[in-house]
């Protein structure tokens, strides 16, 4: 099931390789997100912020953001707080579609976590909807959420 979801996101992301577009993430841009999802580790609920650090490279469509993430992993047996710094490489294949690949570095409960993730957000003006898939301490999962540009 997870492989099918990742394949679907990849296909949607790469459909518009030849499209001309302005960057959805740019230097100085702040994006806030609220997310909920699924995971082998528990139900993830969280907020994230990404700040455009560098933009305008790779034909004007590439950008790098840095930020942070705060979340909860809820299950019948436990609740874990997560806190992480995050960094992303963004590339806009299709106008208004922000695709990104990145890393989170921080804590889940009392454990150190290094999380790789792949995501996409589609914007309707300043507001967007998104999907993100990743791994946290060998627990696969994903989130859906809403985002806003500031």
Feature locations, PLM:
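Short loop/turn motifs that connect adjacent beta-strands in outer-membrane beta-barrel proteins
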Residues: 21-28, 54-64, 77, 93-98, ...
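Transmembrane beta-strand segments that form the barrel wall of outer-membrane beta-barrel proteins
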Residues: 28-38, 63-74, 98-109, 126-137
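Surface-exposed, glycine- and small/polar-enriched segments that build interaction surfaces at terminal
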Residues: 56-58, 72, 81
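Residues on the lipid-exposed face of transmembrane beta-strands in outer-membrane beta-barrel proteins
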Residues: 32-36, 47-53, 70-72, 85-89, ...
């Amino acid at each position: 099931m997870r492989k099918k979801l990742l394949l679907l996101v990849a296909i949607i992301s790469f459909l518009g390789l030849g499209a001309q577009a302005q960057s959805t993430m740019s230097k100085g841009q702040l994006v806030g997100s609220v997310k909920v999802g699924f995971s082998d580790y528990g139900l993830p609920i969280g907020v994230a912020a990404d700040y455009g650090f560098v933009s305008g490279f790779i034909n004007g469509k590439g950008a790098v953001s840095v930020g942070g993430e705060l979340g909860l992993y809820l299950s019948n047996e436990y609740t874990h707080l997560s806190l992480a710094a995050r960094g992303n490489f963004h590339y806009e294949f299709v106008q208004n579609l922000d695709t990104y690949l990145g890393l989170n570095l921080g804590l889940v409960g009392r454990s150190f976590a290094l999380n790789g993730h792949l995501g996409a957000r589609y914007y309707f003006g300043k507001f967007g909807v998104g999907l993100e898939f990743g791994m946290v301490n060998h627990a696969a999962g994903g989130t859906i959420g809403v985002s806003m540009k500031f």
